[in-house]
């Protein structure tokens, strides 16, 4: 197979990637994390850092960008997701650039194609969060580091400092990417270790203003709230399934939820991908510098997060790791090329057939993602429409937690009396007062004949029972609607309680 016009092929791949990411961008309802992003972006500039320090577990760059973007494009669903879609498309081009640094044009194009049509990349690219931006910056900083080591220069190192700092200012996982860079430099580019350490001094100085807020996040335990403590939620099989074909099939985990198939079943499902990755790594053993450049971000991130998860210090959701997909894609493409090369004389046809076979897994996932209304949980738009349609003036809205309030009120902006409960599990110490008492319930029943309960995860059976016991004496249920991840109940005050 002749690769005479890689530029034209790359342009076509980027065009396909753009269509996949910008199509139906506002179709799905925002879920809580996106609504939180929008809510932070609607606050005053000077309030963003204190809000993140008090109630978030991420650094501020993506929130500042969202704040600026909302001022330009508004806070509609498509507008909120536009920046992620742009970053996701840019990552396709950067994946090609990285692959070409370490391999051939076919591997570069195939890597870009894998990322371009990946359901996992599409989902992250249509998520108004920081994951797509992190992926772009991880690739850009890696390319900048290679340029620094190969050609040097103050300007190139300065550019690397800015990109590395931006990576860590986007997500704390960015620090693991930069750590992988340091290991690579120390092992394979020892003459450039001193300049890299000097660059890290520059990154540290740029990061210093955020240090007090980072300390507050750690002290407040923002990264491990009550409903995550003691849980083990790092599922390598689900993560690899998402990278391989978008998960969601054969009992594999999805973008939001863990899977139901056991480890043996996961290995069987993922076996073709595992073999291809193994061949990719094996074919690179003669150029371990390139293999390490591509593989270390994956290895360092995996070891660090697995260690923290096994120790039950932190938990991690597979969707957080979408920034590693380009590195996976390069290794997969290298493996496909190696396997196809064994068909002498028919290498091009074999490569096309193998690629189509592996990527065909993702077609039904994309079909469900775009066209199955039940594929994505947390339809807050539908929940708000229900209350808007059936609600009456003066109805009281009772949110079981702040997550429900922020996500629901993104869509439901009509003024209504409301209360957001704080679970007692979120309070520290043994003497934790109940967030909602029977006295409060009776007071509500006297003032508000109708009450809507709007609930979302985390909403444990204990919380349900506590809330039921407070309300059942003064209210009776008259209606309910269950959505994926959302519960909406309508209650009316009993006659005796409303007097």
Residue ranges, per PLM feature:
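Short, Lys/Arg-rich, polar N-terminal cytosolic tail immediately upstream
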Residues: 1-3
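Membrane-proximal helix-loop-helix interfaces that form the catalytic/acceptor-binding platform
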Residues: 6-497
